[in-house]
Amino acid sequence: MNHEIIEQRAWLMGTLIAIVISIGGLVEIVPLYMQASVISPSAGTKPYGALQLAGRDVYVREGCYLCHTQMVRPLQAEVERYGHYSIAGETVYDHPFQFGSKRTGPDLARVGGRYSDEWHKIHLNNPRDVVPESNMPAFIWLAKGMVDPAEVAAKMRVLRKLGVPYTDDDIKSSAEVVTGHTELEALVSYLQGLKYNGEAGQ
């Protein structure tokens, strides 16, 4: 087929472009859904607890993902700094995933357990109290905002429809778990849960 015939007919060129993109997309995407390692949780991966889930939503609402990633790349420097590189099975319960796109601040995929709860609270209230050169904003209002138990239960029901294995008991007990907790405590709980749960040596 002469290329001039295609170039002179916009509808034909558009149709051929759509066909090529569709085939390319299928070739790239479909195999991923056939790999169990991509769609199955990795060893030790569990759904977020009620307080962690509330904290994850605070993390998203405050735009933390704009400056922090949650994906350790398989590069020597990153593995030495942050720990085991991220694997697909770690994020199967993340809706939406929190890979992020820019590292103004450090990667948080392995931050759980590195610092105390108190350190995180001080850091979130005024980052420069613990990291003098930090350009992170202070989130002082989180200590005043309370977690809404009804909202957490509703989110857990929605996530269950998306495939997260929350039980009826998990949802019923969520109100008791989060009642009386501030958004600051919820965010700290979420951050403390960000760690590699796979088997040693993997």
Each model region followed by its residue ranges:
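Electron-transfer interface patches adjacent to heme c in soluble/periplasmic c-type cytochromes
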Residues: 13-22, 80-184
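Sequence context of c-type cytochrome heme-c attachment sites
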Residues: 32-43, 53, 69, 88-98
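Electrostatic cytochrome c docking/interface patches
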Residues: 36-60, 72-79, 104-106, 174-177, ...
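The canonical Cys-X-X-Cys-His
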Residues: 55, 61-70, 120, 187, ...
